[in-house]
């Protein structure tokens, strides 16, 4: 029997973080716990203690397992920080009125996964960490992540994106990213809704001159080949509606690429390293490129896994009867080989060496 909780864990601790993520999403996926900061034994002890103290409970149905707040945890969080949690733990808000249907729960899990990876990448994602979305254009604090729920709160315009599969948007110094999470499943895209979301961002003037791109998260690199297959609902990923769409995995690799997408200067640093020994790229050439090798062949830096750009590179090489080199991280190589033709040669970067020498240096 869980004992009656008298107090919450301290703020700025992992137990409080887990309670916060659960409060904001409604249900936290069990499988995502291993992605929180800390070793497996410590994470297990945190979850065990929160259950024992009557703050979390496990909800399992139809093979899907998640953590939910107890009524005592809601009461304590509301008393501790009402300005943070009132919008989520009172009234008819979805995190406070949870349903048991699989599609609804999966959506909550996908939201939780993205909030976790944003937090791990040091991107402000909780509502109190950044300006409200309606005031984002006046705020200089970027990067910042806004959930689709926060975006919909702008007013009547928010109803235009009701059917979108986006989990939210990421504002960075390099532009705006509509963010999606396909998790382990194949995404059921809503083509018109996604384009309406893009149009809304353009008309609302959040970052008036910013380029709007997309990020889709998945569980493994193997899912990339599914995303790049012709499909009536997902062709907008490759049809030019979004000139850049990045595929990131929901793990430490994806967190690293996310950091790069948020930091233009760090990407430039990596590009300079990769360009060593190569000739300067040719702008507006018949084959998109970042550099030219000693034999005059194009080279593309593909470590961010911008798959429309990779597809354009591959298609142009085949069209013009040329060969070219695609530079990626070692963990991406096998999946990119699967989606590229014979004209593309792959060259990989050691990810662990990149972490040590560039990302956290």
Segments from the language model and where they lie:
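Long, compositionally biased intrinsically disordered regions
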Residues: 179-187, 199-361
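Exposed, interaction-prone assembly regions rather than primary DNA-binding/catalytic cores
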Residues: 95-190
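Short amphipathic alpha-helical interaction segments
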Residues: 36-53
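Short, Lys/Arg-enriched N-terminal segment that forms or immediately precedes the first helix
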Residues: 1-7
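Short, cationic-aromatic polyanion-contact patches
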Residues: 10-12, 29, 61-82
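Short, amphipathic alpha-helical interaction segments positioned at domain boundaries
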Residues: 72-105
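A short, conserved structural fragment
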Residues: 51-62
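Short acidic, hydrophobic short linear motifs in intrinsically disordered regions
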Residues: 25-36
């Amino acid at each position: 029997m869980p004992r009656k909780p008298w107090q919450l864990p301290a703020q700025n601790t992992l137990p409080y973080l887990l309670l916060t993520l659960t409060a904001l999403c409604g249900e936290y996926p069990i499988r995502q716990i291993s992605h929180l900061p800390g070793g497996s034994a410590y994470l297990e002890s945190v979850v065990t203690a929160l259950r024992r103290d009557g703050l979390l409970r496990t909800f399992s149905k139809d093979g899907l397992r998640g953590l939910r707040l107890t009524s005592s945890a809601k009461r304590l969080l509301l008393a501790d920080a009402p300005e943070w949690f009132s919008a989520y733990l009172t009234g008819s808000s979805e995190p406070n009125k949870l349903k048991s249907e699989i599609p609804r729960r999966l959506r909550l899990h996908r939201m939780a996964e993205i909030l976790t990876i944003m937090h791990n990448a040091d991107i402000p994602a909780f509502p109190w960490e950044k300006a409200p979305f309606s005031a984002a254009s006046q705020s200089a604090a970027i990067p910042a992540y806004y959930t689709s729920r926060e975006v919909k709160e702008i007013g009547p315009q928010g109803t235009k994106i009701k059917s979108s599969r986006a989990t939210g948007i990421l504002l960075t110094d390099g532009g705006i990213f509509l963010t999606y999470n396909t998790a382990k499943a194949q995404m059921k895209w809503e083509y018109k809704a996604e384009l309406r979301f893009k149009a809304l961002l353009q008309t609302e003037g959040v970052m008036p001159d910013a380029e709007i791109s997309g990020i889709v998260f998945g569980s493994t690199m193997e899912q990339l080949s599914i995303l790049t297959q012709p499909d009536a609902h997902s062709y907008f990923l490759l049809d030019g509606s979004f000139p850049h769409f990045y595929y990131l995995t929901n793990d430490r690799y994806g967190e690293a690429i996310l950091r790069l997408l948020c930091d233009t200067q760090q990407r430039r640093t990596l590009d300079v390293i990769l360009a060593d020994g190569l000739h300067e790229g040719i702008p507006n050439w018949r084959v998109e490129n970042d550099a030219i090798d000693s034999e005059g062949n194009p080279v593309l830096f593909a470590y961010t896994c911008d798959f429309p750009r990779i597809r354009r590179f591959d298609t142009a090489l085949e069209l013009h009867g040329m060969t070219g080199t695609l530079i990626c991280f070692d963990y991406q190589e096998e999946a990119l080989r699967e989606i590229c033709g014979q004209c593309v040669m792959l060259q990989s970067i050691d990810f662990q060496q990149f972490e040590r020498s560039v990302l956290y240096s």
